[in-house]
Amino acid sequence: MNRVLEPELMTDPEQAEAYAAADFATVNQGFVDRFRALFPAFARGRLVDLGCGPADIPIRFCRALPAVTVTGVDGSEAMLAPGRRAVGAAGLAGRVELVRARLPGLGRAPGGFHAVVSNSLLHHMPHPDVFWSEVARLGRAGAPALVMDLHRPESSERAREIVETYSAGEPEVLKRDFFHSLRAAFTLAEVRSQLARAGLDRLRCEMVSDRHWVAWGQLPS
């Protein structure tokens, strides 16, 4: 199946609220736990989360790592609005900064972060090289980086099977988004080519489920 682009931003308030209300606890906590297992020495500093959505992952990082501050970046105000409420409710307004920006327009200094993470932003990007360039630019030399995203299946039929397997009980708007996201995602081979073009081929890239891949490692100098 060829890649089919979906909208870069989730701007519909109904769509964003449905996403914020959905139960991604297992996947999101697994992402944080994976980071801690891969980079056990990382315990303090500034972490940036690209495509933070409603800020569940920034909140989980702050709870897991008390000496870490998080800058969450998302291009959609509709997604950040529930995120700001969640950060306030968690009592983490002093440690979580939420910024509305579209890559490459974040405007932060090169090497300004001690760690870079992103879960499920890449498939929204029409030009993936922009994403990887920002990962390389924002993290300082040796910074841990962890990126996870969907893997594009071989056919639309397989994509529908995955949606029904993992989202059967979710609202139709989320099931539709999941299907479109699978079609917009990249294959493992495509991601490895992107990493090579960005000078990030030292990052490891592997499948971790039937629908997710991760790329991880320390950023080059």
Positions of PLM-derived features:
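A short glycine-rich, Lys/Arg-flanked "PGG" loop and its adjoining helix->strand segment in the class I
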Residues: 130-141
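Conserved alpha-helix/loop element of class I SAM-dependent methyltransferases that forms part
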Residues: 25-44
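A conserved beta-strand element that flanks and buttresses the S-adenosyl-L-methionine
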Residues: 117
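Class I SAM-dependent methyltransferase SAM/SAH-binding core
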Residues: 48, 56-105
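N-terminal, positively charged/glycine-rich alpha-helical extensions of SAM-dependent methyltransferases
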Residues: 1-18
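Conserved beta-strand signature within the Rossmann-like core of class I S-adenosyl-L-methionine
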Residues: 143-149
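Core SAM-dependent methyltransferase catalytic element
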Residues: 201-221
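C-terminal alpha-helical "lid/dimerization" subdomain adjacent to the S-adenosyl-L-methionine
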Residues: 150-198, 204-206
